């Protein structure tokens, strides 16, 4: 447990400390005040995630091995893609049913999504860095701590994964995904299924947000009913999504192995 908390604190310290340093360098080099209207947040997020990965790999806090991918689990990766696509709408719908939580990172997220370069930070670097840290390091340490109760480790790692986002509005979705990603890591011992799932999730969210911002939609206040036209259509869409997610989850249950 101590190792898992240590890794989480280190990641947060790098994000806050190094992020502030990169923002200062940005301001000195470009003469621009760092904010969400320019590329400073994209640069900061990308640099911080890259350095986090280098640190965790260099100090061997996270383990990355080609053993699992050498088994050629292409069908498993396809089911990961489908599972990610199938859970998106139900997760958003579930979040809308919950009491509204503060979205303290809304402005920053909109700034990242509004630029095509934001995909580097959201769609590429975030899945790699977060899976390396939270599954490759944090969950690995938790599974070693309590090998007799893997769901405890998975739940704790999912909670830490949700908390590190530091945005209450994102936490329910992050925790839900964290449980699934943790289970996939436990079954395979590899972060690759999680990276693929995470990449698809973030890519779809980025693409949808970018398109909606490009056409002038008010993404800040948009609900699923606004997008689909009625609550009935929303429920139909959620049901169709579950018809994708649940069979995908079943196939992963059958196929995931180390």
For each of these PLM feature ranges, what is it?
Residues 5-9, 43, 77-82, 116, ...:
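Hydrophobic alpha-helical transmembrane segments
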Residues 10-14, 125, 156-160, 172, ...:
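Hydrophobic residues within alpha-helical transmembrane segments
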Residues 10-60, 76-80, 235-240:
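Alpha-helical transmembrane segments in multi-pass membrane proteins
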Residues 26-27, 31-40, 62-132, 139-145, ...:
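Juxtamembrane helix-loop-helix connectors linking adjacent transmembrane helices
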Residues 55-65, 184-188, 246-256:
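Structural signal for the C-terminal ends of transmembrane alpha-helices
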Residues 129-156, 183-190:
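Membrane-interface helix/loop boundary segments of multi-pass membrane proteins
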Residues 163-169:
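Membrane-interface helix caps and helix-loop-helix hairpins in membrane proteins
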Residues 199-258:
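C-terminal membrane module of polytopic membrane proteins
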């Amino acid at each position: 447990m101590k190792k898992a908390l240590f890794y989480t604190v280190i990641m947060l310290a790098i994000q806050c400390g190094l992020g502030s340093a990169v923002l200062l360098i940005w301001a000195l080099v470009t003469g621009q005040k760092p904010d969400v209207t320019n590329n400073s947040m994209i640069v900061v997020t990308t640099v911080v995630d890259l350095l986090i990965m280098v640190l965790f790999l260099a100090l061997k806090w996270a383990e990355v091995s080609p053993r699992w991918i050498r088994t050629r689990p292409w069908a498993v990766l396809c089911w990961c893609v489908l599972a990610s696509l199938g859970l998106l709408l139900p997760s958003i719908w579930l979040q809308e049913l919950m009491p509204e939580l503060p979205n303290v990172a809304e402005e920053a997220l909109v700034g990242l999504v509004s630029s095509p370069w934001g995909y580097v930070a959201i769609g590429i670097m975030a899945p790699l860095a977060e899976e390396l840290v939270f599954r490759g390091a944090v969950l690995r340490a938790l599974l070693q701590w309590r090998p007799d109760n893997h769901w405890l480790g998975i739940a704790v790692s999912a909670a830490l994964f949700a908390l590190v986002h530091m945005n209450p509005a994102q936490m329910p979705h992050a925790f839900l995904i964290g449980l699934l990603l943790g289970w996939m890591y436990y079954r395979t011992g590899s972060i690759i299924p999680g990276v693929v799932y995470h990449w698809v999730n973030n890519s779809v969210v980025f693409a949808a947000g970018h398109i909606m911002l490009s056409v002038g939609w008010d993404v800040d206040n948009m609900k699923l009913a606004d997008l689909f036209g009625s609550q009935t259509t929303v429920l139909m869409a959620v049901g169709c999504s579950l018809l994708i997610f649940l069979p995908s989850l079943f196939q992963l249950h059958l196929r995931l192995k180390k």
